[in-house]
Structures are given as C-alpha cells and as structure tokens.
C-alpha cells in the first residue's frame, strides 16, 4: 500500500464530513468533471451490507435483513450524499447480480487476499450508530470518450465500496475471467480516505499495489494524476459551500450511447468547419450543433423504443439560424424543416434535402404545426417562451425542446424580480412555468456543449387527457392574459396595475412579477393596445409581439458614434492615469524621461465611475464596457478582468506580435492618429519612426481600402 498524496482541508463552514461524501459523489457519478478523457459513468446497481459481516465473513448473512438490493430511493447514512437520479434511471444490473458479485468478491478476498480485505475495510473512526456500520456498494461503468486516437478503450466496470464509519471509499476495477464472470483486477485498486486528527481534516489517496499499477491514460490514469489532480479537486469540492442549481449533465439519456454517437457525428460533419462561410466561430457552432443533434437523436431513439414504433419523428426548428441542426437531423433520417427570419450564406451549401425557409413567426392561429411531432427552439430568442404554447396548440401529440439563451417574455425583454436566484435560473423557471401552464410534464437536463447556457427544457407528455383539450386551452388563454397584466415599465416610471395570475403553476415555483423593457418598440405597441388602441388582430394570441429584425443589428460596439467612444476612452484613460505609475524603459533608442503608465482598475471599478446614461448605452451592446475597451486596443489592455494602459515598449519586446498589432500590416501602417501622441500628458512612449500610428496629420497615410474606393469608376 502506498499513499500517493495527502492534503489538509480548511473547513470554516463546518461542511465536513458531509462535504467529503458530496465530493466523492461527483467523482463517482460525474468523473468527467475531473478526468476530461471520460464521457461519464453509469450507475448499474446499488446495495448495502453490514460492515461487521464484511469483516467477519465478507458477505451478507442470509435472513438478517442486511442483504444487497437495488435501492435508488433509500436514505443514505448521515453525512453521505443521496444517490442521484441517474443511478435509478440507468441502473440495469438486477439486485441478485450485485449480491452474487459481492459474495464472490468477498469470499475471494478472505481466502486469497486478506491484505486487500484489511485495506478495504480499514479501522473504524470510533463508535458509530448501526446505520453507519454499513457498507454501501455501487456497481458502475466508467465510459471513456469515444475518440479516433484511442479506439480500443472500452467502458470499464468498477465495484465501489463506501465505508462511512472509516471515512473511506475504495474502487475495485473488475474484469471478466475465462468463464465470463467478473473478478477484481487487483493491480488497479485505489482508495480515497478522510482523516480527522487533532481537530484537523485530511483527504488522502492510496493505492493498494503501486508496483503493479497499469495506466491506460484514460479510465486508469497515472498514479501521479490521482495524487495531485484528483486529490486537489476533491479537496476543493469537499469544502465548497454551494449547491448546483441545475441537473447533472445528460441525465435523461444514455451516456454510453451519447459518447459513441457524438464521435460518429463529429467525424461525419467535421468538414463543415473547413467551409464555414459565416463570421461566427466555426468550431464552436459546428460542434455545438453536433452535440445538440446527438442529444435529440438519442432522445427520439429512446422515445421510439418506449412507444414501440419505428417511424422517425418529424420536427420544425423555429429560429433555426445557420440551419446546421436541421441539416444534421434531416441527414439522419428525420423529416423536418427550419424557419428563420434571416437567410444565412451557409444555407446554399446544404443541398435540397435540407429544407430551410426564410420567414417570420408571429404566434397566432396561422402559425400552428398540427402534423409535426417536435418543435425545436435552439437559442430561439423572442420565440422561446412561445414554443411550448405553439406546441400545445398545434396538436395533443406535439412535443417541444427548447434551449433558452437570451431572456425574452411573451412581449419584449424579460426582466428579473427574484434576487435570490440567478437571472438564468429565474428565466429557466419562467419557461418551465409556461410549459406547466400549457399542460406539459416538463423535464430539465444539461447538455454537453461549449456554452454557459446549456440547460434544455423538454415537454414530452401532457398532464391532462385529450378529452380535456378545450378546457386546457382556456387555461392557456387565461395564462397569456395574466402575463400581460404583469407590471410593465411606462415612460416616466409609472407601472400598470398587475392582474392576478389564474393559471395553475408548479408548487415549487415562486410567483413573481416580471417587467418588460420600456425601450422596446414591441412594448410600446403592447401598451397602446392595453390603453384601448386596439385588440389583437384576428387569430393573434396577444397584442404587441414583434419578431426580431430581418437585418441583424451590429452590437459589438462598432456601430456606436465615434464621439461617444472617444469620450469613454478618454474618461477611462484619465482614471487610469490618475493612478500614476512612472517608468522609464531600458532602451537607448528611447527617451529616458519618466512616462506615466497609469495604474489598473477592475471593470467593476471603471463602471462605477461612468454615469448611468453611458452604462445603459453600453448595456445594449454585446459585451458592453469590456467590448468597447478591448476594441480600443491601441490604448487599453484588458487582462483577467482588469484594465491597464497599453505600454507599446513592452509590446515591441514580445516575441510574437501583440494582440493590438496583429492587424497592423503594411496596409494600415500610419493610417490612424496615435492616441498617446494626441492625448497622453507625456506623449507617445515610442519615437515616431517606431510607432505604428501617425504622430500628427503629416504622417497620415490613406488606407488601401479608401484608395480602392476612390479609384473605382
């Protein structure tokens, strides 16, 4: 036995020992969080036996009530986390199999490997109640990421033994013998151990047989990784005083099936990255849509199996954007189409089999899809809360999948009212509330995509029978009307009175008032209708809804007026220069006079110095203040959330071209006035010959773009 590492824990919030077991649960059920070469783990079965039985006889006694059984809902011992939802959903091994496996393993330890038995059980931490004298047994399958670089790596089974009384959890890798029976692979047994000594807590990682450890680099990492990387993550998780607001990733689908299909689709559609004609990041968007398509294909595959049908589901993607998701789903045999208000260049590359339509969707009786199985809203913006409503009214069998991103209400922007929740969590609860009010059983899951907003909501079934459709639609209408009664921002700050909400809601959701952005033209139309300017047009469900503009508005601060940008840049620069930081540089070619490089401020500190009107104007742009400062890269350097004055002497000393100089080719050299020459109290830190910007109008050159424009007939 060898201890690979030990770390002392600081526990000011008194989270231990429960925090240790919470950390173990993460490694047990979601090992991919620590080991990026894994796709996840599947909990096959759970059981429990008395610790004393394991020590004395290494097996459960018959007729004593402490044998092994599948128990996904049973309460865990105090200090130990509950089993997750995926454990009960994915567990496939019957109780008898786990019982038989433990009996065989424990008997072999008694007769052939008593040292491992001592390693497994260890000493008790002291007198414990009977519940804490039990061993929890878990059979899990560790699933590696499918990859062309490691095609031979297969899922591995492990028997995990959790001993709360000794503060240990032991991982016993399993392999099949010649007869197909599972037995312990003694070379790769390791243990996580929680110690309490003289008022201090420690976590350690131990290996039973270090000289025989075999690392495959995926499921079985090197011992150094266990003693350093894994141990440090466990130590951090154990004392984190926070609870996730969201479900586990991929909790509603088979992780093994997902891993294999994702790799297949990734290989199949990877060439899209090379020919991507849009200005967006090709790798992010291609692989994100591949991941979403993988999830939907498995979800629909399992749905067909549940219903005993073979016909592939049809779909409509509302607000389909680049259309790649529609293209993949169609190529994989699902009939469907995508609709978006603006055509994309890449649409022409898909071919006629991918049906994409340019058009707007206004929620009304004219925009129903009665023959469609699924409606999809993938970052569908203003249509997101409407998709459950459209699905519910299209047909009783229509289902929906939404992946919310931007926060929209039925009319205009959604604005939060609950400070106890994050804005994202509150918006998800709102969309969940819409689904419930429309009569859906709504499920929530987290996708594995490169995005901070990766929670999807799924409505697969209804809460009412088909015979109650007329009554249920009346409830939907009341709910929509009640949403219009929520306070809306009027000019001058007055609010419309709030009407009571009459639709039924899930008991776990908080009633809240939500306001609409007063600056939106859509809201003004809604207010006009509310004041008697007109009722909804025939067939429209609410007044005031406005689809997004067909022409995409540039929102990266590039379209802001030049004088506004110059004013903000000068104000922020003066704030930094006031925090004087003089330096002289060490090059003989430059002046040795002191030059004020200024101090640094966090983005929050900079924002606190700007007036509310400026902040509101920046807030309407993507990235806001940070984007404006990064765009002004001649003047500023933004690193780790802090703003600095850029020192061009340091830029010239760097080995690779700096961020601010990467685009300063010969074509743009001296085509703009040097900001430091014009505004810095000490002037530019570089001589005119070395500065890529013009020191005065006499140095200005005409850019190549303007030259071509002037030469054109």
Swiss-Prot record:
Protein name: Probable tRNA (uracil-O(2)-)-methyltransferase
Family label: Belongs to the TRM44 family.
Zinc fingers, C3H1-type class: 669-698
GO molecular function: tRNA(Ser) (uridine(44)-2'-O-)-methyltransferase activity; zinc ion binding
Functional note: Probable adenosyl-L-methionine (AdoMet)-dependent tRNA (uracil-O(2)-)-methyltransferase.
Disulfide bond keyword on record: no
UniProt subcellular location: Cytoplasm
A Pfam family matched in the record: AdoMet_MTase
Main location: cytoplasm
UniProt cross-references to Gene3D superfamilies, sorted A to Z: Zinc finger, CCCH-type
Basic and acidic residues bias (residue ranges): 79-89
Reaction catalysed by this enzyme: uridine(44) in tRNA(Ser) + S-adenosyl-L-methionine = 2'-O-methyluridine(44) in tRNA(Ser) + S-adenosyl-L-homocysteine + H(+)
Residues recorded as bearing Phosphoserine in the entry: 76, 489
